[in-house]
Amino acid sequence: MLFNCFGILALLQILPALAYPPCREQMSDPYEFGESDLMRPGMHDTPLSLMQKREALAISLSKRDSVGSYAPYNVTCPSDYMLRPASDGISSGEQSFIDKRIPKINTQMRSFISNTGLDVDVNSVINDSDGPRLGLAFSGGGLRAMVHGGGVLNAFDSRNGNGSSLAGILQSAMYIAGLSGGSWLVGSVAVNNFANITYLRDNVWNLEHSVFAPHGDNVVENLAYYDDLDDEIDQKKDAGFDTSLTDLWGRALSRKLVDATQGGPNITFSSIRNQTWFQNADYPYPIIISDSRLEEEKAIPANTSIFEFTPYEFGTWDNGIKAFLPMEYVGTHLKNGVPPDHKCIRNYDNAGFVMGTSATLFNTFLLEWSQEVTSNSTLYDIIHKVFEKLSEDQNDIAPYPNPYQNFTTTNTTVKNPFERFDTIDLVDGGEDDENIPIWPLLHPQRFVDVIFAVDATYDDSNGWPDGSSIVTTYERIITYNANKSVDVRGFPYIPDEDTIISLGLNTHPTFFGCDGRNTTAGNHTVDNNTPPLLVYFPNYPWVYYSNISTFTMSMNDTLSSGILENAALSATQNNSDSFAVCLACAMIQRSLERKNMSTPSQCSSCFEQYCWNGTTVNNPSAVSNYAPTVLSASTTSGTSSVRAKPIVFYLFASLLTVSLLL
């Protein structure tokens, strides 16, 4: 059993009961206890009967007989050299998907733009493989980000028949990327045959119960649940692989996100390729990202390597490596691209483990917590001992056998940061403060023309985004593109957070980079190397307060419906037909510029209204004073002022303790 991992988690859950040191996003909001997070009062104090223990074990064993194994296994490698240089462009598999998807995108986008009434010859703008390419990017932010992003995605989806003015945008997109809570959204739709959000919410996500207590106050079912988790992780450990908190986290998440018995212990991310929607290229190509952390690091540097998981490949475009491993062989340790003894690993890319990797919040939580707790010396000592142990044991990360050991790239100016390590340690995709997965959509080989960046980040003390995620991406490009450690096409100019808040750029969708000749790439003729136009969709209380804590792990129907509705109305600007026209303008702008076609007068008006015009504001108090209120009354039942109740961490400890006694 994973006594180390469970013991650490148990201690983490108990500590908040002793004191309430705030996380960064909870400075003004102490832990609240909600009924949806609680099990029956006093449950953990009541001794379990022998009958209850036996019943839980019987349930657990019966379920295990019907599912596959979580354990990775050895296979013979398909070739002696397993890495693909990224200088070749995107993989042949991704290219094949894109080639199949282009005609479908062109048809859908022509239909969407025609339906908006935009006065443009859509057949001239969208007629070949050089037509507009749209990428969707969904931020991190736990369950808040998943449900908010789901509301936006629902508004973009033409399958719903809900009269959304933006219906068809999903079907018009080439890529869809997610990190952390956004990876739960992207991963869940991709793994579940791209089911729509209504189906997932009603049948899969089980939002009313916490991932830590999925069966509410049913003691026996919850004990069986933890016994199943323990058994699955032991399968991987017994097969000879390192395990970490992320295995536990990923298996628990899978039961919320994957529509299969026990969350599909043997369902892999690469198996998405076998699903009907993917084989037909009916929906955008999914990408999940995660940050790397070197063994000696406790904090994530701004220039950390960003890794991506796709149905075909795992790797990074950063110039220190710039090479990819086939996704189905993730978990294979390579030396200079060659597998020892011709042995490769399969089944390591478990879908839940991948989503858990992108959302490994534990080390950020611990780091900030350990820095905040100073008033109680005993508590301070306990927390720091736990923190030091995690750092030493690397249990706060997701360990991946290193495919880049002793690997040397063709780029002689940047060193491979992982060349001496046996494992690559991956952490939450937002820990570098780039909390929207824009990065994978900026690579020249993907030719993305416009990015819709959906931001549900908890930036300020009140829980609303202030634009810092796109500011950080902009700063990374300015800093590291210059020294050639990264290779992207550039980015639109982005103002600082003071300006974003002072000008209200985070209160509605805002366009950046409307003029393709005025970006970080310089004043050049617009072509396929021009940086994309960015449409920023911030979370904002249009009809509902959706600024719940990242550590909220359950929602009742009123709350989830309120967040979904608020997200849709905020994204569509109250289902505005005129805003749909403006989004159509953003979608085709780079194509118009490339083809040297004139901008329609409707688009000129749109750009005056929604594009940042370059104005900056020096207002240091803007961020701290930002506290928006709802614009109008919600049509959702209940009140819009309902706040979510974050998970009661210490109850998880009691469950773990009891389950370990089985």
From Swiss-Prot:
The lineage of its organism: Eukaryota, Fungi, Dikarya, Ascomycota, Taphrinomycotina. Keywords: Glycoprotein, Hydrolase, Lipid degradation, Lipid metabolism, Secreted, Signal. It catalyses: a 1-acyl-sn-glycero-3-phosphocholine + H2O = sn-glycerol 3-phosphocholine + a fatty acid + H(+). Gene3D superfamilies: Cytosolic phospholipase A2 catalytic domain (3.40.1090.10). It comes from Schizosaccharomyces pombe (strain 972 / ATCC 24843). InterPro entries: Acyl_Trfase/lysoPLipase (IPR016035), LysoPLipase_cat_dom (IPR002642). The keyword Glycoprotein applies. Catalyzes the release of fatty acids from lysophospholipids. It holds the Pfam family PLA2_B. Residues 1-19 form the signal peptide. Residues 76-617 form the PLA2c domain. GO terms for molecular function: lysophospholipase activity; phospholipase A2 activity; phospholipase activity. Belongs to the lysophospholipase family. It is found in: Secreted. Its EC number is 3.1.1.5. This is Probable lysophospholipase 3. GO terms for biological process: glycerophospholipid catabolic process; phospholipid catabolic process. GO terms for cellular component: cytoplasm; cytosol; endoplasmic reticulum; external side of plasma membrane; extracellular region; fungal-type cell wall. Coiled coil: none annotated. Glycans are attached at residues 74, 127, 162, 196, 266, 274, 303, 376, 406, 411, 483, 518, 523, 547, 556, 574, 596, 613.
